[in-house]
Amino acid sequence: MLGRKIPGSGVLGAGAGMDRGRTGERLHAALAGLQELHFLRDKQSAMVHWALTLNRDQPDPSKQENVSKEELRLEATLSLLKQQLTRLRRQDVGLKTHLQQLDQQITELKLDVCKASTEHLESDSRPSSGFYELSDGGSGSLSNSCTSVYSESLSSSSQTSLLPLLSTSYASHGRSSCGQTGVSRRCSADESTAQSDAPRSGVKLGSSLIRTATARADRARQRPVSTGDLDRMIGPGFGAFKSTDVKSSTPCSSPQNPSVDPKYQSNLVSSNGTEVYRYPSPLHAVALQSPIFSCTSDQGSSVALDEMPEEETQNLNEESTISSSVGYINKLLQRSSSRVNLLSSIKRIETVSGTHEQIPRSQEMIYGSLNGPQLLGSLQQLSMPLENALETGKTSALNNNQKQMDPPCLGSNFKEVEVQMLHHGKHPESSLDLQKNNFPINNTAGKVGAESDNGASEKRSGHFPKDLSVVQKPVERKSSFTSGREGSRASCHDKSSIPQSEFVHAQFVPAGSQRVKVRQADKKTKSVKLRKKSSEKPSAKKQHQKPLSREFCTKNRTDLKQSGSCRGKVTYLEESQAQSCSDCSCNGLINSHCIQNNHQQIPSSKSTKSRKAPEPVYHPLDHAKKKPSSRKWPSSSEIPLPPTLHTQRSKEMLNSRKVAMVRSVSARPRSGHWGCPPPRALPHSLSTSSYFSYLESRYPAAPVSSRHPPRCESEFSEYSAECASLFHSTIAASSDGEMSDYTTNRFGDSESSQGSQTASESDSSLSLDEEDLLEEEEEDEGGLVWAQAAMGTTAAGFSLQQHHRSESAACRIKASRALKKKIRRFQPASLKVMTLV
């Protein structure tokens, strides 16, 4: 009916013929798709049916197989038992002899141990190593351990001997699954377990654990199906589908569907190559029935349905992917090359139009943005010709100069510049600035290498000082960020030396004015008689010595202000003064004096001197001695002892002994109060101060009424003679110098305190004389020792103030036997020898 032509309509007949052909092709494609779907359905149903029958119908034959397998295992175990019995009989003979030898050795050892224990019971107390445990029978432990070790070796030997035998027995029965399949692959874990069940029972037998009932119970349970069984059993079932040709085994060969075009049994590939439908799949069948994949054979150029073999489709896919990747890479290369060309052209224009004014700014930019020496090394050769062109100002002849000097180097440099632009990535402008303005760095960093490489070194050597002077300004500006102190010192040197001299004088003034400042507080002191008596003799000396020190200070100041060539010396002195001031600043009072003298400087010291002229000089030491009587003891945290203090005080003691003065110069207790420990006990000064503070808290101070040192309240009690004899005997035997005077005066020995009364009356003046001698000796040394003298005087003043501040006015000691215990308990490290009687 469709093929019947309508009379009088030729055009319609031609169109109807074309439609008829198209519909016929669609129908054939739909038929092929339906047949493919039927084939897939049959294949899937066969797979499902096989899986169901595998789970349902297998138990009946498996029971029979299990029974036969159990019989075979029993036979194998019987044969193994026989073989093992023969081995055990052979091994028992050796075991018996070995055990007998061990028993003999154990008995011998036991006898030897018994003899040794009876003979050397008291002398030998070493712990035993634990190798021979003789506590539990002796012969039992070693024999048991030996049999256990031997049983383990026996079981291992039985394992190695039984495995090949079982494998041969299984091979003889024809139950080897690997041999059945004939596939040269390794057996899976389940196959190996299925074969090694009997050897495991043999192993159990080898280790004397024979179980026949449990083996049968294990065989009664069905082993689950695993991948090894599926691979072995499913392989032949599905091998028919895989091995047979799909085209020959399709239902198309049935008499109902005699003709099926083989072109519909190939893979479908779309025109753009993105979609591929493999033949035996439901998607392939559906795509055959759709009109999109219908074959338009009348239009030769446009073919919507491409029937190709698998190899051709794979090649087409590979070619499409390769072409797409190559096109993408080509696009990237074109973009990068165009960007590099554009940047290089801009770079050439900007390097021609660059001037000297851009150099300092670009120098800072380069310092901030340089990554490392690679950029310097790569742009070094390029920078020299550009720098020469900029120096001479002949911008028009830049290209000629570059070509004449080193054209290949320039070409390579431009390539390196392009590579660096690509390396910088998203910031080509910053890399352009680097490339444009890199010549100042290269002038400083790589000047020698660039001159040796290029030929016109004479011409450049004339221009280098200018560029270096231009470049050094930003370099100094940058170094001011990195090294701030050095830059500030350099700028101070360039400006003037006035602030340095003022700073030096401000640091130097506390050394001389500190005593003046302490002397100002003499009006508040109470012990006036002692101060007048003790200051009669040394006042003239001190007044004679003080103008010398003042002249020395003013002379140094004028020298520092006038001389401009000794700046390095001034800085060294400044550092030494700063060190001395920092050493003295650990004392709070001295630090406040330093701050005041920083602001007042010379006029303050003059005013204080004019204020104190009628009075005798240097009573502040006595004032400092009397002042701590009204305040509490400082704790150990309030008495810092810097290392310079130890050296200075030891130096004071050496100087005082050198002049043969009284030994209680600065460390022996003054009249009316007690001093710090002598310099020999400086490492233990913290412990002594804590000990004295403890005594002060236990026994409060008594008021001072005379210039004599206070004595114990219980001096005339019944135990005073005992205490005096105790301390005299210990001190005379174990101490010398200041230590004896200090301890006797400290613990209330009336005789020694009265004997040293004349010395203690003038000890203030002697301490001042000691300071004068120190200053004279240090001035004689010459050079830069005036700073050390300042440090010494401040340290000496600090030590004297520490003595008097850290001591109390009096200390009451109850003379009893508990005194010895307390002294022994709270004794400092320096008094251990004296109190341990």
Curated annotation (Swiss-Prot):
The keyword Membrane is annotated on this UniProt entry:
yes
Biased amino acid composition, Acidic residues: 768-782
Query: What GO cellular component is one of the record's annotations?
Result: late endosome
Q: Which residues form a coiled coil?
A: 65-113
**Localization per Swiss-Prot or TrEMBL:** Cytoplasm; Late endosome; Nucleus; Cell membrane
The record's region (Disordered) falls at 189-265, 424-497, 512-564, 600-649, 738-782
The Gene Ontology biological process terms listed for this entry are: mesoderm morphogenesis; negative regulation of nodal signaling pathway; Wnt signaling pathway
- Predominant location category: cytoplasm
Q: Where is the composition biased (Polar residues)?
A: 246-265, 432-445, 741-759
Which superkingdom heads the taxonomic lineage of this protein's source?
Answer: Eukaryota
Q: Where is this motif: PDZ-binding?
A: 834-837
Subunit-level organization: Interacts with dvl2.
**PANTHER family, per the entry:** DAPPER HOMOLOG 2 (PTHR15919:SF13), DAPPER-RELATED (PTHR15919)
**What family does the Swiss-Prot or TrEMBL record give for this protein?**
Belongs to the dapper family.
Record function comment = Involved in regulation of intracellular signaling pathways during development. Specifically thought to play a role in canonical and/or non-canonical Wnt signaling pathways through interaction with DSH (Dishevelled) family proteins. Positive regulator of the Wnt signaling pathway which acts downstream of wnt1 indicative for non-canonical Wnt signaling. Also negatively regulates the Nodal signaling pathway, possibly by promoting the lysosomal degradation of Nodal receptors. Required for convergent extension movements in gastrulation.
Protein name, as recorded: Dapper homolog 2
Species in which this protein is naturally found: Danio rerio
Query: Lineage of the source organism?
Result: Eukaryota, Metazoa, Chordata, Craniata, Vertebrata
Q: What would be the name of the gene that encodes this protein?
A: dact2
